[in-house]
UniProtKB/Swiss-Prot annotation:
The protein, known as: DNA-directed RNA polymerase RPB7 homolog
Entry annotated with the keyword Transcription: yes
Keyword match Transmembrane helix: no
Location(s) in or outside the cell: Host cytoplasm; Virion
Record's keyword terms, sorted: DNA-directed RNA polymerase, Host cytoplasm, Transcription, Viral transcription, Virion
Triggers of expression: Expressed in the early phase of the viral replicative cycle.
Function: Component of the DNA-directed RNA polymerase (RNAP) that catalyzes the transcription in the cytoplasm of viral DNA into RNA using the four ribonucleoside triphosphates as substrates.
Length: 335
């Protein structure tokens, strides 16, 4: 994820007299030299975007070095990965001793260790590109390093899903706070509309839970399941439309919400019902409407970005064909 972050640091200054001749220029140069292109505080810093606050340059009095220091608060454009993030393109650079080592082609520099099962070890070849899901609490940003490290596995679609029990209405103010995430989804959907439809169909079919044919890949905003196959008695709700109605107090968020596997994960759809009749053994998660919608919207963003990235990475038939062994592995290991 790309974001803005604010950092507070103490900067050591070797030559205070020279530094103070042009504090702004020297400070920005020092920050760029020390932090840009490196890991710091659970992020990879892309660029310094501004100095928010700084102290005067103090002289160290604990020794006779003549060095100085300054307290600085600055903002930076950063990239960071979270547990369970999906990365569409990880290039295999090593595959032996039951360990697959890969480098992400799409995110900040990160080396990913994939503890392989025997089948994965036999299938994934050095130089191939595989879709990966990061493991829980597996991303490490060691300060000063030029790349992060993580563990993950070749991403296989799963049947599991969560049910959320909302007992309080979403307020207009909370709905307004969610519009930033809604805008991200709409931008991703617009980007998707410009991609090769055959490639979209291929990857949606690959990562859909149930058997379908490519001509059944419909508009994600109205998707209701494979043709001629009733996978749910409920009519899915378009989360984006629901939130626009919530801004006008025209919708109720009470009840049980879920995104079971009969929906495309990259669709902006979810089910809402008064009583929990979802087919899962997991207990419902009781949470506020705002927390539930943030969770659903971020999941939609994650999958939409993943699908768009797959289409951008494997953007021709030859490249898709060269990775048939990977697609076969994914099909065979679907739960």
């Amino acid at each position: 994820m790309i974001d803005q972050k604010i950092f507070e640091i103490t900067l050591n200054i070797d030559d205070p007299a020279n530094f103070c001749t042009n504090v702004e220029a020297h400070l920005l140069k020092e920050l760029e030299n020390i932090y840009v292109g490196k890991c710091f505080k659970n992020s990879f810093i892309i660029s310094i975007t501004g100095v928010i606050q700084r102290s005067p340059c103090f002289i160290m009095r604990t020794n006779n070095s003549g060095r100085g220091y300054m307290h600085v608060r600055f903002s930076a454009l950063v990239s960071y990965l979270n547990a369970f993030d999906l990365i569409a393109a990880v290039k295999i650079i090593k595959n032996d001793n039951n360990i697959i080592l890969g480098e992400s082609l799409l995110t900040e520099p990160v080396t990913i260790v994939i503890p392989s099962s025997e089948s994965q070890n036999n299938v994934a070849e050095v130089g191939q590109i595989v879709p990966v899901q990061l493991a829980n609490s597996s991303v490490y940003y060691i300060p000063g390093r030029q790349q992060a490290s993580a563990t993950g596995s070749i991403f296989i679609p799963k049947h599991t899903f969560s049910v959320y029990h909302v007992q309080e209405e979403l307020t207009q103010e909370q709905a307004l706070n969610l519009t930033k995430l809604v805008n991200v989804i709409e931008t991703l959907l617009d980007s998707r509309s410009k991609k090769d439809f055959k490639h979209i169909c291929f990857f949606e079919k690959l990562y859909y839970t149930y058997p379908i044919s490519s001509d059944e890949i419909l508009d994600l905003k109205i998707w209701k399941g494979p043709k001629g196959k009733e996978v749910s008695r409920l009519k899915p709700c378009n989360v984006l439309s629901f939130l626009y109605d919530a801004l006008k107090n025209k919708s109720s968020s009470l009840g049980f919400w879920a995104r079971p596997p009969d929906l495309f994960k990259s669709s902006p759809l979810a089910y809402q019902q008064d009583n929990n009749s979802f087919n899962t053994t997991e207990l419902p998660i009781i949470c506020s409407a705002e927390v539930m919608f943030v969770t659903l919207l971020k999941e939609i963003i994650n999958y939409l970005q993943f699908m768009n990235d797959l289409c951008d990475t494997f953007n021709n038939e030859q490249l898709i064909k060269r990775h048939e062994n990977i697609w076969m592995l994914i099909e065979q290991r679907k739960i």
